[in-house]
């Protein structure tokens, strides 16, 4: 699972940045395989899954999405399945969601694919892509253009089943401690911007930094970073 502000003419650098939130589920937890149990027994069986996220608990916007998912699942299953949502650092680090689900220690996770670029470089194309598609175009590609099948193919070796779970849509660029009036102003700029967007910043002379959302305000305030992008 971002928001942003550059002055013209560089204002359009991330204009078509969209951010897809991902619900990742441990393969083998779907219950599709035959258990040999009586149907009435299965109906009475209760399931309680743990969902870890990259956002602080009840974080505005992104952090509320997994809570809504948990509520809907409990309602639609008539209470047969409950999902306990954990914020970043409550059980795993903000960037530990992928490994937690892949290893089987947790059944579900809610995060953004560009955090795993070291493990799955192609996952970045399912998160924020500079000059990329709008929210509607992303949805069309994912659901009607074969995108979802590709996504699941690249996650399959990690025993993970990805499900789209939110899209922030087209965004601006970022928040800065100084005005950006020319390309020279980007030289040496330390900006929290993961994924492909970070590669663009690096080519322009900036220094991309990856930080969890819960640390951004303090990092910007204390000068650890000069700028940040976020929803």
Describe the function of each predicted region.
Residues 1-48:
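Short, low-complexity disordered leader/linker segments with a strong preference
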Residues 35-38, 70-74, 112-208, 213, ...:
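Contiguous mixed-secondary-structure segments that line small-molecule binding/active-site clefts
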Residues 50-67, 88-93:
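Extracytoplasmic "Venus flytrap"
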Residues 54, 88, 196, 213-214:
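An acidic- and aromatic-residue-enriched active-site/binding cleft used to recognize and process polar
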Residues 83-87, 210:
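A structural preference for short, hydrophobic beta-strand core positions in alpha/beta folds
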Residues 94-98, 216-219:
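Short, hydrophobic alpha-helical packing/hinge segments within bilobed ligand-binding/sensory domains
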């Amino acid at each position: 699972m971002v928001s942003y502000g550059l002055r013209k003419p560089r204002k359009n650098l991330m204009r078509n940045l969209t951010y897809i939130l991902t619900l990742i589920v441990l393969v083998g937890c779907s219950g599709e395989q035959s258990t040999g149990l009586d149907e009435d027994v299965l109906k009475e069986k209760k399931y309680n899954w743990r969902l870890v996220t990259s956002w602080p608990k009840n974080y505005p916007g992104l952090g509320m999405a997994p809570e809504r998912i948990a509520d809907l699942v409990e309602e639609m299953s008539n209470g047969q399945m409950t999902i306990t949502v954990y914020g970043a650092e409550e059980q795993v680090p903000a960037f530990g969601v992928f490994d937690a689900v892949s290893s089987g220690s947790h059944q579900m996770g809610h995060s953004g694919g560009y955090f795993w670029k070291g493990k799955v470089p192609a996952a970045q194309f399912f998160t924020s892509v500079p000059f990329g598609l709008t929210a509607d175009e992303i949805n069309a590609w994912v659901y009607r253009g074969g995108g979802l099948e590709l996504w699941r193919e690249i996650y399959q070796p990690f025993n993970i089943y990805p499900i789209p779970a939110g899209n922030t849509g087209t965004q601006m660029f970022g928040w800065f401690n100084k005005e950006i009036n020319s390309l020279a102003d980007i030289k040496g700029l330390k900006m929290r911007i993961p994924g492909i967007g970070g590669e663009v910043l690096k080519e322009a002379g900036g220094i991309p930094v990856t930080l969890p959302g819960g640390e951004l305000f303090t990092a910007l305030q204390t000068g650890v970073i000069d700028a940040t992008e976020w929803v």
